A protein has these predicted regions:
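Alpha-helical residues within the helix-turn-helix
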Residues: 33, 50-51
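Residue cluster at the C-terminal edge of the helix-turn-helix DNA-binding motif
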Residues: 51-54, 82
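Short, hydrophobic-biased segments on the C-terminal half of alpha helices
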Residues: 46-47
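Key DNA-contact positions within bacterial/archaeal DNA-binding proteins
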Residues: 40
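Non-DNA-binding regulatory cores of transcription-related proteins
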Residues: 68-134
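N-terminal helix-turn-helix DNA-binding core of bacterial DNA-binding proteins
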Residues: 5, 9-11, 15-37, 56
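Beta-hairpin "wing" of winged helix-turn-helix
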Residues: 54-68
Length: 134
């Protein structure tokens, strides 16, 4: 399992906005330039994050992008899943009937535990904590 480049860009964009605070708007061109994100990629990412309720967008001369919630209320998991969908290490975790291993296989609980730990870590990590770490 690998977090996609698009999800990585989304995390960087939200982190950029979190550093600005919830009231300040950022032009998407500024976010793209400062975070080295291709503008066409960023437009799609912002749309997905807006649909997920993580960002507010506004058009026009005074438009831009802002966080929809306080950085402490946005988890890393929410951003990644808004872009990549639910975290799934492999087909043996979460999808009944699609695993090549027998249900009694000793590897299945290892995959399940690893996924639970990853999801838990991403869920417990919020953007306020990340910007505080610098």
């Amino acid at each position: 399992m690998q977090i996609t480049r698009q999800a990585d860009y989304a995390v960087r964009a939200v982190l950029h906005l979190a550093r600005m605070g919830t009231r300040d708007r950022a032009a998407t061109s500024t976010v793209a330039k400062e975070q080295n994100i291709p503008p066409s990629f960023l437009a799609k990412i912002i749309s997905q994050l807006s649909i997920a309720g993580l960002l507010h967008t506004s058009r026009g001369a005074r438009g831009g992008v802002t966080l929809a919630r306080d950085p402490k209320d946005i988890s890393l998991l929410e951003v990644v899943e808004a872009i990549d969908g639910p975290i799934q290490l492999n087909e043996c975790v979460g999808n009944e009937g699609t695993c090549a291993f027998d249900e009694s296989s000793p590897i299945k609980p290892v995959w399940s535990d690893a996924q639970e730990e990853l999801v838990s870590r991403l869920k417990s990590t919020n953007f306020a904590d990340m910007i505080a770490q610098k």
